[in-house]
Amino acid sequence: MDIAAAREIGAGIAVIALAGVGIGLGNIFSTLVSSIARNPAARPHVFGLGMLGFALTEAVALYALLIAFLILFV
């Protein structure tokens, strides 16, 4: 196995984290929608927490892509 193949395999393994991010984002927003549907008065507080969860979960995706690009191109 040459170095180019090892880099591509390593980058593919690093991007596996994106599957978890997709599941996490779906869970965050489904819970957000159902909690707002149950108690519309709590929308400002719940929406802020949902956006914080979205940002933190999306940061994991950006870190995974960064690591994959570092493996491929550095």
From Swiss-Prot:
The keyword Transmembrane helix applies. It comes from the Bacteria. Pfam families: ATP-synt_C. It is found in: Cell inner membrane. The record marks E58 as: Reversibly protonated during proton transport. One of its GO terms (cellular component) is proton-transporting two-sector ATPase complex, proton-transporting domain. The chain crosses the membrane at residues 9-29, 54-74. GO terms for molecular function: lipid binding; proton-transporting ATP synthase activity, rotational mechanism. Keywords: ATP synthesis, Cell inner membrane, Cell membrane, CF(0), Hydrogen ion transport, Ion transport, Lipid-binding, Membrane, Transmembrane, Transmembrane helix, Transport. InterPro entries: ATP_synth_F0_csu (IPR000454), ATP_synth_F0_csu_DDCD_BS (IPR020537), ATP_synth_F0_csu_sf (IPR038662), ATPase_proteolipid_c-like_dom (IPR002379), F/V-ATP_Csub_sf (IPR035921). The keyword Transmembrane applies. It is a multi-pass membrane protein. Its main location: membrane. SUPFAM superfamilies: F1F0 ATP synthase subunit C. Belongs to the ATPase C chain family. F-type ATPases have 2 components, F(1) - the catalytic core - and F(0) - the membrane proton channel. F(1) has five subunits: alpha(3), beta(3), gamma(1), delta(1), epsilon(1). F(0) has three main subunits: a(1), b(2) and c(10-14). The alpha and beta chains form an alternating ring which encloses part of the gamma chain. F(1) is attached to F(0) by a central stalk formed by the gamma and epsilon chains, while a peripheral stalk is formed by the delta and b chains. F(1)F(0) ATP synthase produces ATP from ADP in the presence of a proton or sodium gradient. F-type ATPases consist of two structural domains, F(1) containing the extramembraneous catalytic core and F(0) containing the membrane proton channel, linked together by a central stalk and a peripheral stalk. During catalysis, ATP synthesis in the catalytic domain of F(1) is coupled via a rotary mechanism of the central stalk subunits to proton translocation. This is ATP synthase subunit c. The lineage of its organism: Bacteria, Pseudomonadati, Pseudomonadota, Alphaproteobacteria, Acetobacterales.
